Amino acid sequence: LSAEGSVCRPASMTFLASPMDIRVNPGLIARIAGYMNRYMVYAVAIHPVPLRYPGRGRLVYPGMVQLGNFMSLSLRSHIESHVQYTQDVYHGRFDDADKFRDFYDEYFSVLDCTAEFYLETLENVFIDQTLPKGLLTYEGKKVDCAAITDIPLFTVEGAKDNMVNEGQCQAAANFCVNLPDELKESYVQDGVG
């Protein structure tokens, strides 16, 4: 949009825990992506919606698979949280138990993702890293982050994030080579992941 001088350009850009460049401080997901391809992901993660549900037969990345993958990244802390919840209920600490329930009500609220969107995202972000390599296209044109010269950029990361490691979101600032430093801001929250 900046390259075209579009009136639809955003007033600012804010990225929250976004894997802008997984080659920066690579973690488990980046290592796995190094040997994955579209066909492997398709075989393992893409499933048809069961016949008894609306959308039957549509290919999706099931929310339950995503939830299992999320939980497996920090399984020990989830187990500890569930044990603590049981103890809180047993000992009558219902305020703490309610906080647990509120968190997991939201955490467990995952939806199926269309196969097309999921596969395209995996390919562009994790397998091919098209944005940091300057290969990402939109409507047939290469995305040119160097054209961004006056749109403030703000990145936010969690220091303990085990999915988007610290620095991967901040890397967005490196793509905007013509954006003045005073328009680039980053924040890392300690203890959050």
Across the structure, where does each feature detected by a protein language model lie?
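Conserved alpha/beta-hydrolase "acid-adjacent" motif
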Residues: 162-171
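Short, conserved loop/helix-junction motifs that constitute active-site signature segments
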Residues: 7-8, 145-150, 176-181
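Short acidic (Asp/Glu) and glycine-rich catalytic loops that position anionic groups and cofactors
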Residues: 97-103, 151-152, 189-190
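Active-site nucleophile elbow and catalytic-triad environment of alpha/beta-hydrolase enzymes
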Residues: 126-145
